Amino acid sequence: MARIAGVNIPDNKHTVISLTYIYGVGRTTAQKICADAGVNPAAKIKDLSDEQIETLRGEVAKFTTEGDLRRDINMKIKRLMDLGCYRGLRHRKGLPVRGQRTKTNARTRKGPRKPIRK
């Protein structure tokens, strides 16, 4: 198994699919990485040379991925909560942030139903 950006990449999958195992790298980004590195996207990771894997590592390093990306996202949410803006309050209360209805639905964000006290 190759290790790129601190993630074990599966050997038996195509390069594009394998790169999506990295948090912050989707299909489009993976295709761009392969194109910039000059690697065939349909080639399997086990068939790539060490030199090609090194170029992939270099290309992935240009993007914000894994822990840095998670930290960035959490810091942005924390900033909204500290500002006290509407979006921050919704994050703090655990409700939908982007204007969805909450009278019905929104169960994923609100969590399981709580019994009504009498």
Swiss-Prot record:
Pfam families attached to this UniProt entry: Ribosomal_S13
Keyword annotations of the record: Ribonucleoprotein, Ribosomal protein, RNA-binding, rRNA-binding, tRNA-binding
Coiled coil: none
Residues that span the membrane, as ranges: none
SUPFAM superfamilies the UniProt entry points to: S13-like H2TH domain (SSF46946)
Gene3D superfamilies the record matches: 1.10.8.50, 30s ribosomal protein s13, domain 2
Residue segments, region Disordered: 92-118
GO molecular function annotation: rRNA binding; structural constituent of ribosome; tRNA binding
Gene Ontology BP terms: translation
Gene Ontology CC terms, in alphabetical order: cytosol; small ribosomal subunit
InterPro entries: Rbsml_uS13_C, Ribosomal_uS13, Ribosomal_uS13-like_H2TH, Ribosomal_uS13_bac-type, Ribosomal_uS13_CS
Similarity annotation: Belongs to the universal ribosomal protein uS13 family.
PANTHER family named among the record's database cross-references: 30S RIBOSOMAL PROTEIN S13/40S RIBOSOMAL PROTEIN S18, SMALL RIBOSOMAL SUBUNIT PROTEIN US13M
Subunit structure: Part of the 30S ribosomal subunit. Forms a loose heterodimer with protein S19. Forms two bridges to the 50S subunit in the 70S ribosome.
Functional summary from the UniProt entry: Located at the top of the head of the 30S subunit, it contacts several helices of the 16S rRNA. In the 70S ribosome it contacts the 23S rRNA (bridge B1a) and protein L5 of the 50S subunit (bridge B1b), connecting the 2 subunits; these bridges are implicated in subunit movement. Contacts the tRNAs in the A and P-sites.
Name of protein: Small ribosomal subunit protein uS13
